Amino acid sequence: MKRLPILLLLVLAATSAFALDTVTRGKRIGVLVSRERYEGAESAMSASIAKYLREELVKAGFDAFDTKVTYDDLSRNATTAADYYVEIAASDATGGVPGGIGIGNSSVGVDISVVIAHVAAEVRLYDGRSLELVHRFELDKSRKGIAPTSISIGGSNLFAWIAIPITEVVQFRRAAHAVAKEAAIQVAEYRQAD
């Protein structure tokens, strides 16, 4: 009877020991803030891609979080809280309106145009333990759509015209989201191969 509790304790300890998996990597991914060398539109595009990337990683089943630090800050700080870190190392966005048509009468008019947005990004994946670069990939996506781009009001003596920039912003957001979705797929494929 005295041996039964000891035997039970040994069985429970052995079961707990086998439950520890030191080989499989976790699903915790930190999304790093872009380096400070980016300004203006590049910084905004990089931040937008990072936001969408975190959302796409969460949809894919990862425990993704915003680190609120750059890679340089993380490398100086010895503590790491993720299995992998993702950084949007570079981003670029171009776009424009290659053509359109004006519709209206003598008082009111609307320009309807083709709006094109192209977004490219370099995404880097770092090991969470050593902070070494383990994978780098370049992505680019384009989105286009037809939308009203300006409104005009006029008469016989005066004519006023105002642009509607939101249509271009929407296309850039769609392209940034497409880049982030592709980046999440690439990260998931790399993790499965690891």
Regions found by a protein language model. Name each.
Residues 4-13:
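Sec-dependent N-terminal signal peptides
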Residues 104, 150-154, 191-192:
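Short, charged/polar low-complexity linear motifs in solvent-exposed/disordered segments
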Residues 139-161:
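Short acidic, glycine/tyrosine-flanked loop/strand segments centered on an H-E-D-like triad
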Residues 16-17, 81:
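N-terminal compositionally biased, intrinsically disordered segments and leader/signal-like regions
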Residues 78-136, 140, 144-147:
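Surface-exposed short loop/turn segments
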Residues 18-71, 76-77, 161-194:
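A structural "domain/chain start" motif
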